[in-house]
Amino acid sequence: MARGQLYIISAPSGAGKTSLVSALLKEDKLAQVSISHTTRQVRPGEQDGVNYFFISREEFLAQAQAGDFLEHAEVFGNFYGTSQAWVESTLAKGVDVILEIDWQGAQQVRKLRPEAKSIFILPPSLEALQQRLESRGQDSAEVIQRRLQEAANEISHYPEYDYLVFNDDFDHALEELKSVFRAERLRLSVQQVRFEAELRGMLSSQSS
């Protein structure tokens, strides 16, 4: 069985990353979003091991100290991390693992997993991004401006990624995202493992 591929997907807030990944997973049964470990409280409707692995702050810090996380960060006083063991066991089953992380997390992962493929999703423009953030109706004008500044910083790191997807049209962007996954699964190193018996049979019949 061919191993799964590790993917990093990053985007500025409001670029449509979560919606694109959700749409991808509805059609692609060989991919899964990483389930992070976190120290924050469980919210209504969430399940341990489904949405997150909920652990104590002490457990998290001990695991981080032991090097158990591919990447980890503190967000609004809570810790979030990606378990190396969970990622490895999922990849070993032939399932692709998607890490939805920012550029800083991506840099951490690349140091430990240089074979990871990374995809950056862009909005058509900062103006379009501002319109999307405003249309949500969730944030004040001040928060939106801060998010736009953060987005500009995030976008400046796009050259660090392997693939670039412009989300100016959702369906087109989704097709491009799916194309990346299809192309990676057709790489020689993957196909050699997947069709090992068939290839061996063809070559042995030639030599006999």
UniProtKB/Swiss-Prot annotation:
Localization (cell): Cytoplasm
Predominant cellular place of this UniProt entry's protein: cytoplasm
Ranges of residues in domain Guanylate kinase-like: 4-182
Disulfide bonds: none
Catalytic activity: GMP + ATP = GDP + ADP
Enzyme's top EC category: transferase
EC number: 2.7.4.8
Matches recorded under PROSITE patterns: GUANYLATE_KINASE_1, GUANYLATE_KINASE_2
Molecular functions per Gene Ontology: ATP binding; guanylate kinase activity
SMART domains noted in UniProt: GuKc
NCBIfam families tied to this protein: guanyl_kin
HAMAP family on file: Guanylate_kinase (MF_00328)
Protein known as: Guanylate kinase
Source organism: Hahella chejuensis (strain KCTC 2396)
